[in-house]
């Protein structure tokens, strides 16, 4: 992989029914039904909606042998109606179910965390090396017969690791780490290679975008060390709904797609499954536009670690850089100074116009020609105004420059002026690559000026802005390069307030600045036995004002307690119409009737002093 120049990773080809993937095949789009798998008609109708929206694979939850056998009828019905889209069985806990599903589905997803190992209990287990080897042998004994069935039936498999369902065995040896997630996957991949079974797709997912990206990068590195090139399925679990789900998914998945990683994706939204497909398509199409872009010559900083990045060292200039939270700058070139109190920018960039009505809690950036020395007013320069910048008396200055503009003269000026905040601009097809090049040039030159990324768009739909800007910012945030974001959408189709909200949403999705309640909510599947979408809406209505609180809303226990380990409170399906409530990892109350559960959740939050009116 070239860190600055886009090219797609060359993966093995995998044959999934009539729709192969990997290699030079297109990046495939998929979704998962949320109907009951024993309801053949409902599954078929929902699968058709997914397919007609553009879905290329349809996954169905497969809890038991009955559900696995019913895949035969679902598959037959779809084929009889002219649909050839492959079906994927989603299996947890039971190898026998996987073996039956392999007879009727074109692909079977298994979870290494619960395929052989017992369900996760968060207990610390101690193994000698000999005992650990015996546990691996148990995997071989159950996994190899499954591979043989898949060989006989030309069935592909996905080895799908979830952060929320790592086994106690893996957790005890590796901890709750990316390394543990990678090893959980590699244990199964090594058996596949040994058995010469190569029709394998892999995924490593988490609701935490940073962990998800770090782990996939680490997995690719480990596969390369072991001469493997299995294709990647990408996704952010429990991304949520609405703009939060879109931004979080685009940031995590986009950060990897922009590096050429990924052969199929699923955008997991807590919405109708077919609603996921257009979002995924927009994301893939946007990233692929950079194929064949003009080459970006750049040198990676020796101290940068792609699989374990740390924040770039900068000096603090006012409230920007150093160890401070990244800032949001809002471009207000039309003299519209209205701001939201919840998503209030740290600075407004007003161009050549000095605003008359100013707030004391916001900084104002103006072009140097408009600067008058007033309090909270800061001058901005371009890279052709270095002499003026050098002699300017302001104690905090902003320099707009591109990578190509970062010449020796500019860098010499920056060495003399640590009080300058750099605002990076790019018109390149691969703006991520050019922004990275600029940041690494600063590192290589020992320059520690804070770095803000100016992301310019011209969108008419808010969803398009959210997807593109999150994808462009994802890797910059995860690589530790971002001290701030200036997000601007040219035209008046999207309000400044919505642009600001998107900028704050990106920083929160990248886990570097919190501005609102965070919801870790799954998309639901056939295991979800309550109305997920309406429940999420009710919980949000009651808790949206609790800034910084994390609430998990999960359909079932497969990933629930694990993915919610980072949440303050959890709402988890426990059976038909029944809910369990959690505080952190601890189950506080079980089997609450669904109609009482939201109220009980609010009572639990209040009882622990985390609720504010």
Show the residue positions of the predicted features:
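Beta-strand/loop-dominated core regions that host nucleotide or nucleotide-derived cofactor-binding catalytic loops
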Residues: 576-579, 587-610
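Catalytic alpha/beta core domains of metabolic enzymes, predominantly
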Residues: 126-143, 148, 170-320, 398, ...
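C-terminal accessory/binding modules appended to enzymatic or scaffolding proteins
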Residues: 322-343, 531-575
């Amino acid at each position: 992989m070239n860190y600055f120049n886009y090219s797609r990773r060359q993966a093995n080809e995998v044959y999934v029914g009539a729709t192969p993937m990997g290699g030079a095949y297109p990046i495939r789009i998929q979704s998962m039904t949320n109907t009951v798998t024993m309801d053949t008609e409902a599954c078929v109708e929902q699968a058709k909606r997914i397919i007609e929206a553009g879905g290329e694979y349809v996954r169905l939850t497969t809890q038991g042998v009955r559900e696995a056998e019913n895949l035969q009828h679902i598959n037959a019905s779809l084929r009889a109606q002219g649909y050839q889209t492959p079906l994927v069985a989603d299996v947890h806990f039971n190898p026998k179910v996987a073996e039956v599903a392999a007879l009727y589905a074109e692909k079977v997803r298994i979870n290494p965390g619960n395929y052989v190992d017992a369900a996760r209990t968060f207990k610390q287990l101690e193994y000698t090396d000999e005992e650990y080897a015996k546990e691996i042998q148990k995997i071989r004994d159950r996994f190899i017969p499954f591979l043989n069935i898949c060989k006989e039936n030309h069935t592909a498999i996905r080895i799908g690791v979830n952060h929320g369902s790592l086994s106690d065995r893996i957790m005890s040896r590796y901890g709750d780490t990316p390394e543990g997630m990678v090893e959980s996957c590699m244990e199964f991949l090594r058996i596949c290679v040994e058995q010469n079974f190569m029709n394998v797709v892999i995924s490593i997912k988490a609701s935490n975008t940073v962990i998800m990206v770090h782990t996939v990068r680490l997995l690719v590195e480990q596969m390369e060390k072991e001469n493997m090139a299995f294709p990647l399925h990408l996704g952010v679990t429990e991304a949520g709904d609405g703009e939060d789900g879109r931004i979080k998914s685009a940031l995590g998945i986009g950060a990897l797609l922009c590096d050429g990683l990924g052969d199929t994706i699923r955008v997991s939204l807590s919405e109708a499954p077919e609603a996921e497909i257009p979002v995924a398509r927009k994301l893939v199409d946007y990233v692929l536009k950079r194929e064949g872009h003009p080459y970006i010559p750049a040198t990676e900083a020796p101290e940068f670690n792609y699989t374990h990045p740390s924040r770039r060292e900068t000096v603090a200039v006012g409230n920007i850089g150093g160890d401070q939270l990244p800032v949001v700058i809002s471009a207000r070139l039309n003299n519209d100074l209205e701001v939201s109190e919840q998503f209030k920018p740290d600075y407004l960039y007003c161009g050549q116009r000095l605003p008359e009505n100013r707030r004391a809690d916001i900084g104002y950036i103006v072009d140097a020609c408009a600067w008058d020395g007033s309090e909270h007013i800061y001058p901005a320069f371009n890279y052709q105004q270095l002499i003026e910048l050098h002699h300017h008396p302001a104690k905090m200055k902003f320099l707009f420059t591109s990578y190509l503009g970062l010449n020796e003269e500019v860098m010499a000026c920056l060495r003399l002026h640590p009080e300058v905040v750099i605002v990076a601009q790019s018109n390149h097809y691969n703006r991520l690559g050019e922004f990275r090049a600029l940041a690494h040039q600063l590192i290589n030159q020992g320059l520690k000026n804070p770095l803000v990324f100016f992301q310019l768009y011209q969108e008419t739909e808010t969803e398009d802005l959210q997807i593109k800007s999150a994808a462009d910012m994802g890797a910059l945030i995860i690589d530790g390069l971002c001290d701030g974001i200036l997000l601007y959408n040219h035209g008046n189709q999207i309000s400044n307030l919505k642009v600001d909200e998107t900028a704050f949403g990106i920083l929160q999705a990248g886990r570097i600045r919190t501005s609102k309640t965070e919801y870790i909510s799954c998309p639901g599947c056939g295991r979800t036995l309550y109305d997920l979408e309406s429940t999420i809406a009710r919980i949000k209505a009651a808790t949206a004002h609790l800034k910084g609180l994390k609430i998990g809303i999960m359909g079932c226990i497969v990933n629930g307690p694990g993915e919610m380990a980072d949440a303050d409170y959890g709402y988890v399906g426990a059976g038909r119409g029944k809910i369990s409530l959690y505080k952190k990892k601890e189950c506080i109350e079980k089997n609450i009737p669904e109609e009482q559960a939201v109220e009980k959740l609010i009572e639990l939050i209040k009882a622990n002093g985390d609720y504010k009116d």
